[in-house]
C-alpha cells in the first residue's frame, strides 16, 4: 500500500492498470467530498467557515454524483481489460475478448444488489433515526433496484451463454471447471435474476432482500 502514490510520480500512461488506479483515486476523492457534507454539518458549529464550503458541496451534489458514476464505469471495464493480456491465467470458460463488457455489466448488477443488501442492514440498525418519508419510500426503492437487477442479471446470463457458445467452449462444461461455471451461472446469476423478478412483481420485500444476498454472495 505504501507504493500506491508511485503511479502519480512515475505515471505509466500506456498501462491499463494506471488508468484503473487513477480512476479509483479520483473516485475515492469524489466520495470523500460527497461524504464531507455530514461531518461539516456539526463541525461548522465550532468552525463557522465550514458553512460556506458545505453550501458549495451541496450545490454540486448532482455534478459530483454524475462524475462518480462515470468514474466507476471506467475502472470497472478497465479491470476486465487487464485480463485480456493474460489468456493463459484464465480458464477458457471465463476468458473472453469481451471481458471489459462483462466486468462492466456485472458491476451494475453488483451495485443494485449491494444497495439492497446494505440498505437492509442499515434499516434494521438505525430505522428509528429515519424520518417518515424515508421509511415510507424505502420499500419502493428496493423494488426499483430489484427490477433493474433482474434485467441486468438476466442480460449478463445471456451474454455469457452466447459468448460460451460462440467460442465453442461447450465441451468444457463436462469438466470440473465446467461444473463450477454452471454453479456460478445458475445459482449466482440466473437464480437471483428470477428471484428479483418474482419479488418485484409480487412486491415481496423479503424475497428481494434474499435475492440481493444471493447475488452479493456470488
Question: Which positions does each model-derived feature cover?
Answer:
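Membrane helical hairpin/interfacial module
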Residues: 1-5
Amino acid at each position: 500500500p505504501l507504493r500506491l502514490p508511485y503511479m502519480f510520480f512515475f505515471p505509466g500512461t500506456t498501462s491499463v492498470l494506471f488508468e484503473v488506479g487513477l480512476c479509483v483515486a479520483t473516485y475515492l476523492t469524489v466520495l470523500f467530498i460527497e461524504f464531507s457534507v455530514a461531518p461539516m454539518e456539526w463541525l461548522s458549529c465550532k468552525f463557522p467557515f465550514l458553512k460556506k464550503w458545505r453550501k458549495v458541496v451541496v450545490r454540486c451534489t448532482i455534478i459530483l454524483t454524475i462524475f462518480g458514476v462515470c468514474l466507476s464505469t471506467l475502472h470497472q471495464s478497465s479491470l476486465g481489460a487487464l485480463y485480456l493480456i493474460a489468456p493463459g491465467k484464465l480458464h477458457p470458460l471465463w476468458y473472453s475478448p469481451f471481458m471489459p463488457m462483462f466486468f462492466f455489466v456485472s458491476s451494475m448488477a453488483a451495485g443494485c444488489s449491494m444497495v439492497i443488501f446494505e440498505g437492509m442492514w442499515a434499516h434494521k440498525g438505525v430505522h428509528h433515526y429515519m424520518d417518515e418519508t424515508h421509511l415510507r419510500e424505502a420499500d419502493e426503492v428496493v423494488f426499483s433496484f430489484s427490477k433493474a437487477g433482474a434485467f441486468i442479471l438476466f442480460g449478463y446470463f445471456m451474454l455469457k451463454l452466447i459468448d460460451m457458445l460462440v467460442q465453442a467452449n461447450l465441451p468444457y462444461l463436462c469438466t470440473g471447471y465446467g461444473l463450477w461455471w454452471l454453479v456460478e451461472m445458475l445459482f449466482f446469476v440466473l437464480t437471483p435474476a428470477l428471484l428479483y423478478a418474482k419479488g418485484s412483481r409480487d412486491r415481496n420485500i423479503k424475497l428481494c432482500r434474499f435475492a440481493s444476498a444471493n447475488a452479493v454472495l456470488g
